[in-house]
Amino acid sequence: MRLAQPPDHDAILNVRQLNVRFGGQHILENINLDLYRQQVVTLIGPNGSGKSTLVKTLIGAVTPTTGQVAIAPQQRIGYVPQRLHLDPTLPMTVKRFINLPRRHPHRSVQKALEDAGAEALIKAAMSELSGGQFQRVLLARALLAKPDILILDEATQGLDHRGTAEFYQHIESVRRSYGCAVLMVSHDLHVVMRTADHVLCLNRVICCEGKPEQVASSPDYQALFGDQTAQTLAFYRHHQHEEAANAG
């Protein structure tokens, strides 16, 4: 069930008692989630934990078995998928791709590409883009909606460390300039520590949630990802605090 107004009037997106079953199998069970303006929420979890199913439910591509998803009135959603497969034989430029399924004003296209760091690619062939360039074009396409909520489903999968870092820099810039909330599925756990306000660890149910350092020290998190990962996250968090102190 989708409602027009979240029960929590401060939230722009609200999920309550969400359950998704396929063929009698529980994919998601009793999921509760609130998303607030300009907040960055990250979903983490092992493969097959239901992360992508939750994202597809939020954008309306999957209908929940029970429960509700409520979005505040007039809130626009931008979506960046994990990967989009295009026929490499199609002679399609970035400009043509970003105008599908309908044309947008040229200035709007230019601004979206600029905000995504892809302005130099407007005449490039989609088939010739690198992985990082392709994802920036997908981000630009999502920004054409001028989103209040930006949802990313493992949008950096397959990118190298440099490409991943550059992509997340654009996401942070977009969050500030658009004032949007960001909900992202990520396997880049060190990025979670640097960028997320709130983390949900999903394994069919929400195993644990909270600030990144709270989740990293949770027994449920450590059971899924191991003590070594928690130590790595603590290391990144420590250096993040050092950077903030030096900046001050």
Where are these regions (language model features)?
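Conserved ABC ATPase "signature" region
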Residues: 107-121
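Conserved ABC ATPase signature
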Residues: 125-129, 133
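Catalytic Walker B motif of ABC-type/P-loop ATPase nucleotide-binding domains
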Residues: 150-153
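H-loop/switch region of ABC-family ATPase nucleotide-binding domains
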Residues: 186-187
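H-loop (His-switch) and adjacent beta-strand-loop-beta switch element
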Residues: 199-211
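ABC ATPase nucleotide-binding domains
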Residues: 217, 224-248
